[in-house]
Regions:
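Mid-domain Rossmann-like dinucleotide-binding core that forms the NAD(H)/NADP(H) cofactor-binding site
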Residues: 11-87
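Local beta-strand N-terminus motif with an aromatic residue
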Residues: 34, 79, 105-106, 188, ...
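Short glycine-centered segments of the SAM/dcSAM-binding site in methyltransferase folds
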Residues: 36, 60, 108, 129-130, ...
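NAD(P)H cofactor-binding loop motif with strongest signal on the N-terminal glycine-rich segment
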Residues: 41-42, 113, 136
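Adenosine-nucleotide cofactor-binding segment
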Residues: 55-117, 168-174
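Glycine-rich phosphate-binding loop and adjacent beta-alpha segment
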Residues: 65, 74, 116-187
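C-terminal hydrophobic helical "lid"/dimerization subdomain
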Residues: 169-220
């Protein structure tokens, strides 16, 4: 079963990424039209999905990443702006995010990265904002100075998309129906940057390790 608007390679890149984005932004983050959404890791699969869903929901989408060349692609996916998280080898994005949000900061932060990126995210979140914990691609699980949550009134929200559906089967079905519907309407389009045959599986892993990925890689 796949959305009729996608070919099989695109469909292979669809389910997990877009379900994660939907559970994160709709179910857990309660993202509202007009809010400022900061998407970390925006050039990867789950980030790409969050950018596209954020646009569909009417948010002001700010995409982040470490490569300006890759980040330019996020504008095609619906991002309003993009911001480099690292400058001269140091994490530095919070002032730029505040500038893009009239000094308020992001209302919702979608974070599959963790590490230093999370540490700086708590400095550029709006009062009453929600930080969605999607993963730790940086390799470091961050800790939180809990007084920051009190001072800025923000929430830390964990996201496990698959478990969300297993705990509530009815909502799990509704989530899948929703992402298929949005896709069929033409609002979702997974970007597959490269395809490998099954015999090239080893090469596909090497390609991922070189950090060339934009969107998704598919092994067919």
């Amino acid at each position: 079963i796949k959305p009729s608007t996608l070919n099989f390679s695109e469909a292979a890149a669809f389910q997990t990424a877009y379900l994660t984005a939907y559970v994160s932004l709709v179910r857990r983050g309660n993202l509202l039209k007009g809010e400022n959404l900061l998407v970390h890791g925006s050039t990867g699969g789950v980030g790409m999905a969050a950018v596209q869903l954020g646009k569909y929901l009417g948010a002001n989408v700010i995409a982040t990443g470490t490569s300006e060349e890759k980040l330019k692609k996020t504008l095609d996916w619906g991002a309003n702006h993009y911001v480099l998280t690292h400058k001269d080898g140091e994490v530095d994005f919070r002032n730029e995010v505040k500038d893009l949000t009239d000094g308020k900061g992001a209302d919702v932060i979608y974070d599959p990265v963790g590490g230093d990126v999370f540490d700086h995210s708590i400095r550029c979140i709006n009062w009453g904002g929600r930080i969605l914990i999607v993963g730790f691609a940086s390799g470091r699980i961050p800790t939180l100075p809990i007084n920051m949550a009190l001072i800025k009134g923000f929430s830390i929200v964990g996201v496990r998309a698959g478990e969300y559906g297993r705990k509530n089967l009815k909502k799990g079905v509704e989530n899948n129906e929703a992402i298929f519907k949005i896709c069929e309407e033409g609002h979702f389009k997974p970007y597959v940057c490269k395809e490998f045959s099954l015999e090239q599986a080893k090469e596909s892993i090497h390609y991922l390790s070189q950090r060339k990925l934009v969107g998704k890689v598919v092994v067919t």
